Amino acid sequence: MPQVDPELFDRGQFQAELALKSSPIAAFKKAIRQFREVLDNRFNSGRDIRRLIEDRAWCVDQILQQAWQRFDWGDDADIALVAVGGYGRGELHPYSDVDLLILLDSEDQESFREPIEGFLTLLWDIGLEVGQSVRSVQQCAEEARADLTVITTLMECRTICGPDSLRQRMLRVTGSAHMWPSKEFFLAKRHEQQRRHAKYNDTEYNLEPNVKGSPGGLRDIQTILWMARRQFGSLNLHALVREGFLVESECSMLASSQEFLWRVRYALHMLAGRAEDRLLFDHQRSIARLFGYEDNDVKLAVERFMQKYYRVVMAISELNDLIIQHFEEVILPCEQPVQIQPLNSRFQLRDGYIEVTHPNVFKRTPFALLEIFVLMAQHPEIKGVRADTIRLLRDSRHLIDDEFRHDIRNTSLFIELFKSSQGIHRNLRRMNRYGILGRYLPEFGHIIGQMQHDLFHIYTVDAHTLNLIKHLRKLNRPEMAEKYPLASKIIDRLPKPELIYIAGLYHDIAKGRGGDHSELGAVDAEAFCQSHQLPLWDTQLVSWLVQNHLVMSTTAQRKDLSDPQVIFDFAQLVGDQTHLDYLYVLTVADINATNPTLWNSWRASLLRQLYTETKRALRRGLENPVDREEQIRQTQTAALDQLVRNGIDQDDAEQLWSQLGDDYFLRHTAGDVAWHTEAILQHPDDGTPLVLIKETTQREFESGSQIFIYAADQHDFFAVTVAAMDQLNLSIQDARIITSTSQFTLDTYIVLDADGDSIGNNPERIAEIREGLIDALKNPDDYPTIIQRRVPRQLKHFAFAPQVTISTDALRQVSVLEVIAPDRPGLLARIGGIFLDFDLSVQNAKIATLGERVEDVFYITDARNQPLADPDLCKRLQAALVEQLSQDNGRDTLPTRINF
């Protein structure tokens, strides 16, 4: 800390200003305002961050000393003002806690009550927010003994005013000889860190990480120092070098990482104007600019900044693991005789932890850099890696070069890991943590720490990739069969499970390069398989899976699975049952690893339907596609059987059906046809819309709720319906719209509640929805077409230009309008309003929300029930949609595309 810095605080000038005024408050406030402005300016000009946070603590010291001296504490008073916690370390960020301990010799506070109250009131009046406690030395001891947080806080303290002897006494009575011996303290702190990491999902890669508390954050560095201080009395990172727990290069890396996070935290506080340790989307772009990052053709500035952040915290996590493992070996020595169990000439187990048999193992036999992970997969009882061996792994990474990568011993070992019966994910994570995986596979090294700046992908590319492999492994567990019944069954019968893991490792390997990552990744996957001597069939399968890893999900969510042509086209792409099995399992794992909230019963049912229908098509043979007329006859016959049993006249049913057209029977099950028909025939002819609601029984819509609406067709039917559903907090997943020759509309919507669950059999909720829809459809002119609701905070930071594409489906005689746009409340109602303005009818719709973006497909016709054929009309429609969907967006529009 500086001895004196007049630009920050000029004691003489401050005293002079105090003397001129009757109240000290203005002078104190001016001094605080001045040093804050100076320090912020120094930060913006790039001054050393360590000096800045120490200078801020020094400035607060000066303010507190001046405030303390204004009160009469008596001669030789046994009272001291002590800085504790981060402030006690002499580190303060702009809005960090200023934690103070007013330390007394005895519990009798009465003689100091008045000056203490006056002192704290003055601090409040001048705007210095502090956290304070008033304790005697004995009270400190009692509370520290009972509370890990208290003892940790008191370990870092310094006297600001008053006799330092009180603090020294307090340190003696709270020392490890009296409480919290180093072993007990280490175990408690390690458990505390584990709980804290669990709070952040045990990953450094959260979308909005906490720079202080998340894994790899500042708290992880401080935890190491607290443990060291309790055991060795060491106070800083350099002391750990002297004690042999760090080497100089590791110490330098930790110090530079700490300084980077300090700069991020300082910027966060400055931008937020308050104590803010979460790296929120609100601030990520601003800090990226502040740190000098700029967008380029491949990556946004914010993505480059966050990749730097993630790589820094991953490095901290790696060293945190190493040092804590080292501490464990020193602080928790085994009370039993050391157990040595040889594994081979290169490795042995020492009390359950694997270690090298001599320090030159990796130098003499470089293949051991991979062998150690294979051994851990083969011996799941191994607890971990000993600290010295972790350091040797880190120090030997340079041995992995092109010659190493093409050595058949190494390629064989790497493939052997994928063939292990267990431990694949765990040891790939270890390889990544210790820097081996990215070194062995340089293409993987490029995606380490690479974020995708959206809400759909909540992990970095490398974390997502390893999570995918974790989910693949979970599918093998018996307890997962209930949640993933089909995937669990399929993965057990895959002929070569190692191929799905390799495909998983490579499926996103080309992210961030520009271009189609699926195609680029397929090339990388093929090269990997060839260099690892995989047979031709295996190589082609892995490459095909990488190239097509998105196709099944896209087909299930964006195409009409009741259309036989959709199933036929997908079956043609897949080609055989083996490819279908591998692709289905990979897709399930990919969705789960992308974002846990994406996997719900709705998406599960869509994928299951696509898998089942494709399996039938493959069994039937691609040369024998479904006969549409036969499918219609089967549906009508089965529906008629149900209706006749329920007392419905066959002629009445067939008369109604004659008005509906083929699409209706292709897009509904026999059960739903019977349900609709019976309700329509029994519905009074009084102009009131018929609204039916039930849990859907269709396989592709399992776990959704089906809303069927039958009413006289009207110009604004779709717009009013979707606006009403939006106001009823319903999320539309699918829309099937049929207009009869008698100008009645038969609309089927598959919906979920806004929270993603089905409506269920809640009579009150069903009545609310039915009444709301009937009222809206009976009074369309009174109904608001767009619901104005607040845009959630996170969505605001992922605005992008809407894309609108129009093409023609000649077979179905409809125009296909695809919309990709930022998700916003009332978005479907906005789109429906545009359709209304252009006199368009919606025949079908597929709705998909992916994080902050929607990818919706509408099958539309014009007023004559024909596809859109006028290019000028299409351009005006696109322009209107883009303008409407760009509101509150703030981004330029992207080029749109029209195909006829």
Swiss-Prot record:
Q: Which gene encodes it?
A: glnD
Q: Region entry Uridylyl-removing: which residue ranges?
A: 343-705
Protein name according to UniProt: Bifunctional uridylyltransferase/uridylyl-removing enzyme
Function as written in the Swiss-Prot or TrEMBL entry: Modifies, by uridylylation and deuridylylation, the PII regulatory proteins (GlnB and homologs), in response to the nitrogen status of the cell that GlnD senses through the glutamine level. Under low glutamine levels, catalyzes the conversion of the PII proteins and UTP to PII-UMP and PPi, while under higher glutamine levels, GlnD hydrolyzes PII-UMP to PII and UMP (deuridylylation). Thus, controls uridylylation state and activity of the PII proteins, and plays an important role in the regulation of nitrogen assimilation and metabolism.
Q: What is the lineage of its organism?
A: Bacteria, Pseudomonadati, Pseudomonadota, Gammaproteobacteria, Pseudomonadales
Recorded hits in PANTHER family, A to Z, give: BIFUNCTIONAL URIDYLYLTRANSFERASE/URIDYLYL-REMOVING ENZYME, BIFUNCTIONAL URIDYLYLTRANSFERASE_URIDYLYL-REMOVING ENZYME
User: What does UniProt list under activity regulation?
Assistant: Uridylyltransferase (UTase) activity is inhibited by glutamine, while glutamine activates uridylyl-removing (UR) activity.
Chain spans, region Uridylyltransferase: 1-342
Q: Which UniProt keywords apply?
A: Hydrolase, Magnesium, Multifunctional enzyme, Nucleotidyltransferase, Repeat, Transferase
The domain section of the record reads: Has four distinct domains: an N-terminal nucleotidyltransferase (NT) domain responsible for UTase activity, a central HD domain that encodes UR activity, and two C-terminal ACT domains that seem to have a role in glutamine sensing.
The EC number of this protein is 2.7.7.59, 3.1.4.-
* Cofactor(s) it depends on: Mg(2+)
Name all ACT domain ranges. Answer: 706-789, 816-891
Q: Which GO terms describe its molecular function?
A: [protein-PII] uridylyltransferase activity; phosphoric diester hydrolase activity
